[in-house]
Amino acid sequence: MKKNVLTYTVVALIILAACQGNQPAPPANTGLPADAAAIMAERGLTQDDAYAALKTYIPSGKTDPYIMFASGGQGGQVLAIGVPSMRILKLIGVFTPEPWQGYGYGGSSDETLQGGDMPDGSPLRWGDTHHPNLSETNGEYDGQFLFINDKANARLAVIDLRDFETKQLVKNPNSINDHGGAFVTPNTEYVIEGPQYAAPLGWEYAALEEYQDKYRGLITFWKFDRTKGRVDPAQSFQIELPPYWQDLCDAGKGVSEGWFFCNSFNTELATGGVELGNPPFEAGTTKNDTDYLHIFNWKKAEEVFKAGNVEQMNGIAVIRMETAIKEGILFFTPEPKSPHGADVTPGGEFIVVGGKLDPHVTIYSFEKIKAAIDGGGLETDGYGVPVIPLDKSMEAQVELGLGPLHTVYDDKGYAYTSLFLDSAVARWSLGGAYAKLHPEDPWKLVQKLPVQYNIGHITAAEGDTASPDGGYVVALNKWSIDRFANVGPLLPQNFQLVDISKTGDQMKVLYDMPIGMAEPHYAQIIKADKLKPFEVYPEVGWNPETMSVDPNAITDASQAKVVRDGNKVEVWMAVVRSHYTPERVEVNKGDHVIWHFTNLERTRDATHGFALAGYNINLSLEPGETQTIEFDANKSGTFTYYCTEFCSALHLEMIGYFLVKP
């Protein structure tokens, strides 16, 4: 009977969804099953609600066709979210310790976090994640790696999507913060980290009165070794820039491959000081009518780096600004003031820029940019950088509304731009080769869809690749206000799923998703079938750090042992449902303890935990995983260790004693 009611309900929803308009549910006498009609009437559901329910519903046991990776903002993490169900699948620990995964509480993850510490060794244990970027092959997501930046501390993270774990953190030695990162070149040759606020290189002290002379911008091209799954600083380089505040970036592809584009603001070179009677930064950095779109020939920069025409600074190669100008690496063109988004179209023909204080988006033609560069004779800015006149680089402008920011694309020749002040998603028609894909005239606003509220970033299904999928856009709204139950003054963010499957003005909001543990910025949506994660680690004894069998792994509980060598005690422990071997470990106060764990399980989802009371140690051991912790037994007493992951009916019995003699 229950199955029949569910079937009738779904059929009823389909019938209702086929209707047009935003009308209340029909009464029971329409022929619908009474249960279905009653449910809809009781809940006050409309036909649009029924349509949205069908578009987002994933039956139990089924999986989403897409996965979205969203930054966690000042939470320092990454969220993996199913689309269209909008279900959180995983929180990935990145720059901040995360106890559920045992990230940062012993084991190899401690070493990963230490890799992102300050050059003097000072620990950094939180981050402000902003822009995740998936690895690409030929401008398409390949599902192998994910990169993300830490704006607060100018760091880059590498996440291996075989196990959804962070493998490397890299601290930028010459920038103190960043924003335009992480962005990849079309074959992930480089992961680009753009700067944000100008500072002396290496963040050395210099008075703000010396701003124009001693402060600089800096963009970093981190070389990525795909085989090792690591950034290689020795093969990476940086380009010195004027002290404008560089912002978001995007790599050229297709016809513009080999080039790179970044926004900037504060071409006024404002230094603030409202307490001194100076204009505040928000006024001082917005006086000019335009700022500068930065245009990089990164292929040429790579040649200059390989030729050795660089300076070494704090362990990394730097192409000085004078060299970048002389070698034809760096160019500018005016862009709308206070821009926030430089987004390359799928074929690389155009770059779209939204200026927060201009109701238009400005579309730049790469063909025109290249022609202006090749033609020469360009005037320069105050630092000698060639500036392409706007009329020599611009293809079109489209008036969209207030506060345009970021732009993504679909498979129908449309662009989608977030409008922060209007709280709307703007759909507009592209020109050029894209005009044949949609029925509208090129470069026209098609629809403005209200969203709730103050949308910042926007993402679409594979929407910044060489071949976007269409179907869905997600509005990453900064304010939720009244959309969810009141949980106190700190409110969740609101991700809204938008249906873009139909042409014209048929966009619809399908779903509101509260994000109550993060303040996400950018996100990317990948086809789920491009991801090939492990179900269990390939072999018993697998080290997630090296992605190989650990030399200290054991393959059977009979190999478990405790060995003392002077004041060093080394433990090889087997972990399996529902016990540890050994269950007693006894040491002396002051001993140095090295403890190896191997989860012997080969069953999917048979994860075990290890929590050692009093010593701030907490591990998550996935099936087949080996981990090692190392610490000094500096507290005498009786301490328990137990499995934190509910693994079996006798989960509570999976414990042991760590005895430390005075």
Set out the residue ranges of the language-model regions.
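Extracellular/periplasmic metallocenter environments
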Residues: Q559, L621-P662
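C-terminal motif of bacterial Sec signal peptides marking the signal peptidase cleavage site
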Residues: I15-A18
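Short, conserved, GDST-rich strand-edge loop motifs in beta-rich repeat architectures
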Residues: K55-Y66, H131-N133, G143, E193-Y215, ...
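Surface loop/turn motifs at the tips and blade-to-blade linkers of beta-strand repeat domains
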Residues: I92-F95, D128, V170-N174, S236-Y244, ...
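Short loop/turn segments immediately following beta-strands, especially the blade-tip
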Residues: V83-R87, L161-K167, F221-V231, I295-M321, ...
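Repeated scaffold domains used in trafficking and secretory/extracellular systems
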Residues: A52-Y57, W100-Y105, L124-T137, N174-V184, ...
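Beta-propeller domains
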Residues: G73-D117, I148-P173, R226-R230
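N-terminal edge beta-strand
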Residues: V562-H592
